[in-house]
C-alpha cells in the first residue's frame, strides 16, 4: 500500500532498504510522519501513532478518516491544472478561511502537482503526459482501504520529541525521519537546525524502545553513533532539488539494534506497490 501524499523528503524510494530492518514491536511511532510512507507500507502494529507539526498534514489524515467520501469526491473531479495548483497553494497559505475537506484537498493537490512534490513548489509539468498519468493513478489509488489503514491510528500534532518520549516503551519502534538539517523540506515554517538535531539525538540516547533515524551523512550523528554503539546502514539515492539538479546522495539509516532479518519478515513486509 502506498502513501496517498508522497512528497519531497519522503522515504518511498528507500522502502526496500527500510522495511527489512524493522524489528518486532507492538507500538509504532512516526514523530515526523509527513507522508507516512513507511507506515502505509508496513504491516499494522497493535498501536500506531503518527505526528507532524504541520497541522495541514494531520488535518489531511483526519479528513481521510472522517470525511473520506467528501474528500474522494473533490479528488475525483481534479484535473492537472496550473490554476487548481495555484488555488491549492492559496488554501494552504490561508487555511483559516477554508473547510477541513478543502484544506485536505489542497494538500493532496500540492503533493501531486508540485515539482518534486514540494508543497511550496512550482507547478510540475512535462511533455510526455507522465504527470497526468500519475494524477489519474493517484485518484484510482485513493480508496477506502487507505482509510481503513488509519482506523487504529492515533494522530498527534505536537513537538516530535514529546511524542517519542510519551509513547516510548521497551516494545516500541520509533521510525524517526526529521527534515534534513538546515532545511524545511518545503513543508515547515521553521528550519530544522543543528540544535534541533542534537536535542533529538540526546533523546534517542535515552529511549527504552528501538529506533531507526534517517538522515544524510552528518558528523554529529556519527559522533553519537560511535558513542552509543548505534549501527549506521549506508545507501545511495537520487535527490531532485530542481528540474535540472538531480544528484546522488548518501543516506543513513541509524539503528540502536542489531539487524534481525527473521523478525522483519513479520513486521516489515512491503504490502505491494
Model-assigned labels for residue ranges:
Residues 193-273:
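Long, positively charged, glycine-interspersed low-complexity recognition regions
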Residues 39-44, 166-169, 221-227:
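Short loop/helix-cap segments at secondary-structure boundaries that form the rim of catalytic
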Residues 24-27, 46-47, 150-154, 205-211:
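Short active-site oxyanion
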Residues 33-37, 141-142, 216-219, 258:
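Short, polar loop motifs at secondary-structure junctions
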Residues 188-192:
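Short, surface-exposed loop/helix-turn segments at secondary-structure junctions
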Amino acid at each position: 500500500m502506498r502513501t496517498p501524499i508522497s512528497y519531497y523528503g519522503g522515504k518511498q524510494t528507500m522502502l526496500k532498504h527500510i522495511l527489512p530492518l524493522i524489528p518486532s514491536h507492538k507500538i509504532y511511532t512516526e514523530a515526523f510522519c509527513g507522508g507516512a510512507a513507511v507506515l502505509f507500507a508496513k504491516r499494522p502494529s497493535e498501536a500506531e501513532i503518527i505526528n507532524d507539526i504541520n497541522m495541514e498534514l494531520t488535518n489531511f489524515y483526519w479528513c481521510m478518516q472522517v470525511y473520506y467520501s467528501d474528500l474522494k469526491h473533490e479528488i475525483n473531479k481534479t484535473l492537472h491544472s496550473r490554476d487548481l495548483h495555484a488555488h491549492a497553494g492559496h488554501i494552504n497559505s490561508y487555511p483559516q478561511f477554508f473547510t477541513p475537506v478543502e484544506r485536505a484537498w489542497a494538500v493532496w493537490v500540492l503533493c501531486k502537482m508540485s515539482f518534486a512534490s514540494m508543497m511550496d513548489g512550482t507547478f510540475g509539468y512535462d511533455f510526455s503526459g507522465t504527470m497526468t498519468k500519475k494524477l489519474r493513478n493517484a485518484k484510482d489509488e485513493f480508496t477506502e482501504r487507505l482509510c481503513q489503514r488509519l482506523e487504529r491510528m492515533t494522530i498527534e500534532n505536537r513537538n516530535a520529541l514529546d511524542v517519542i518520549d510519551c509513547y516510548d516503551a521497551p516494545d516500541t519502534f520509533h521510525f524517526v525521519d526529521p527534515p534534513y538539517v538546515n532545511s524545511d523540506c518545503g513543508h515547515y515554517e521553521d528550519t530544522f537546525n543543528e540544535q534541533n538535531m542534537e536535542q533529538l539525538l540526546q533523546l534517542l540516547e535515552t529511549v527504552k524502545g528501538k529506533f531507526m533515524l534517517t538522515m544524510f551523512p552528518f558528523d554529529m550523528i556519527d559522533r553519537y553513533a560511535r558513542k552509543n554503539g548505534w549501527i549506521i546502514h549506508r545507501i545511495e539515492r537520487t535527490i531532485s532539488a530542481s528540474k535540472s539538479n538531480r544528484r546522488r546522495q548518501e543516506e543513513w539509516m541509524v539503528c540502536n539494534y542489531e539487524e534481525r532479518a527473521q523478525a522483519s519478515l513479520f513486521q516489515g513486509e512491503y504490502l505491494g506497490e
